[in-house]
């Protein structure tokens, strides 16, 4: 494997290999091993982010440093992009500086595949438009696998703005490849018009979705949707699709809750549900566990692509 631009066509064996390696790295992060080799020494990794990021950018930075690599942080606002330089020219110039890999986030769907087509260096997609976000999905799947022991046969509902979500797409591809049952839930205006090619079920009633699901992946509601004609109001969305204690207690179903962040508290998810990591209650939040797992998963991706 040379690049990771998406999970759409990634075989189950490759996903399992990455998750198994991530499990090894997670143990080493908890219990440091002095014999652990820094396999990315002298490797330069460019973090090329054309969109804002906290978790993904810092996670890749920390992952690379754990493996002995060095990172170069790129900000579009402080670069020649602000003077009109194209994405392709930016990448070619960084490549000329002997960068070994590009971790790319861009607003345009397909940007990562475009870059992979013009450079001989490794390309990792850190989110491109509404297309894919493969490492986020891998860490979500890793979190589920750690909790349940396996992903195959699980019922996973993806809740919220599925239509515009790269996280949703990558999770659907990865979860389906590993044998999970996947459903989406949200207002009809924020769901796919046709899901036959994806093999997912559709719920427009959140209570029924919770009854069916073992875990819920709650997506960030992009607040501009309320003014873009997709939603009557944020209050209306929260009433019908917000995940809160009242709804969970009504259904009386214990649910594992994931969220890629950042969170719109009291809109897509309540404070109690977002922060609950111990009972009592009908849910368990994995939000911070996801963030921790992201470092190990991205270490596995970097190791596999650059030193494997």
Swiss-Prot record:
<feature type="binding site">
    <location>
        <position position="105"/>
    </location>
    <ligand>
        <name>carbamoyl phosphate</name>
    </ligand>
</feature>
<keyword id="KW-0665">Pyrimidine biosynthesis</keyword>
<dbReference type="InterPro" id="IPR036901">
    <property type="entry name" value="Asp/Orn_carbamoylTrfase_sf"/>
</dbReference>
<dbReference type="GO" id="GO:0005829">
    <property type="term" value="C:cytosol"/>
</dbReference>
<dbReference type="InterPro" id="IPR006132">
    <property type="entry name" value="Asp/Orn_carbamoyltranf_P-bd"/>
</dbReference>
<dbReference type="Pfam" id="PF02729">
    <property type="entry name" value="OTCace_N"/>
</dbReference>
<dbReference type="GO" id="GO:0044205">
    <property type="term" value="P:'de novo' UMP biosynthetic process"/>
</dbReference>
<dbReference type="GO" id="GO:0006520">
    <property type="term" value="P:amino acid metabolic process"/>
</dbReference>
<feature type="binding site">
    <location>
        <position position="261"/>
    </location>
    <ligand>
        <name>carbamoyl phosphate</name>
    </ligand>
</feature>
<feature type="binding site">
    <location>
        <position position="220"/>
    </location>
    <ligand>
        <name>L-aspartate</name>
    </ligand>
</feature>
<dbReference type="InterPro" id="IPR006130">
    <property type="entry name" value="Asp/Orn_carbamoylTrfase"/>
</dbReference>
<feature type="binding site">
    <location>
        <position position="166"/>
    </location>
    <ligand>
        <name>L-aspartate</name>
    </ligand>
</feature>
<keyword id="KW-0808">Transferase</keyword>
<dbReference type="InterPro" id="IPR006131">
    <property type="entry name" value="Asp_carbamoyltransf_Asp/Orn-bd"/>
</dbReference>
<comment type="function">
    <text>Catalyzes the condensation of carbamoyl phosphate and aspartate to form carbamoyl aspartate and inorganic phosphate, the committed step in the de novo pyrimidine nucleotide biosynthesis pathway.</text>
</comment>
<dbReference type="InterPro" id="IPR002082">
    <property type="entry name" value="Asp_carbamoyltransf"/>
</dbReference>
<comment type="similarity">
    <text>Belongs to the aspartate/ornithine carbamoyltransferase superfamily. ATCase family.</text>
</comment>
<comment type="subunit">
    <text>Heterododecamer (2C3:3R2) of six catalytic PyrB chains organized as two trimers (C3), and six regulatory PyrI chains organized as three dimers (R2).</text>
</comment>
<comment type="pathway">
    <text>Pyrimidine metabolism; UMP biosynthesis via de novo pathway; (S)-dihydroorotate from bicarbonate: step 2/3.</text>
</comment>
<dbReference type="GO" id="GO:0006207">
    <property type="term" value="P:'de novo' pyrimidine nucleobase biosynthetic process"/>
</dbReference>
<feature type="binding site">
    <location>
        <position position="133"/>
    </location>
    <ligand>
        <name>carbamoyl phosphate</name>
    </ligand>
</feature>
<dbReference type="GO" id="GO:0004070">
    <property type="term" value="F:aspartate carbamoyltransferase activity"/>
</dbReference>
<dbReference type="Pfam" id="PF00185">
    <property type="entry name" value="OTCace"/>
</dbReference>
<feature type="binding site">
    <location>
        <position position="56"/>
    </location>
    <ligand>
        <name>carbamoyl phosphate</name>
    </ligand>
</feature>
<protein>
    <recommendedName>
        <fullName>Aspartate carbamoyltransferase catalytic subunit</fullName>
        <ecNumber>2.1.3.2</ecNumber>
    </recommendedName>
</protein>
<dbReference type="GO" id="GO:0016597">
    <property type="term" value="F:amino acid binding"/>
</dbReference>
<feature type="binding site">
    <location>
        <position position="262"/>
    </location>
    <ligand>
        <name>carbamoyl phosphate</name>
    </ligand>
</feature>
<feature type="binding site">
    <location>
        <position position="83"/>
    </location>
    <ligand>
        <name>L-aspartate</name>
    </ligand>
</feature>
<feature type="binding site">
    <location>
        <position position="136"/>
    </location>
    <ligand>
        <name>carbamoyl phosphate</name>
    </ligand>
</feature>
<feature type="binding site">
    <location>
        <position position="55"/>
    </location>
    <ligand>
        <name>carbamoyl phosphate</name>
    </ligand>
</feature>
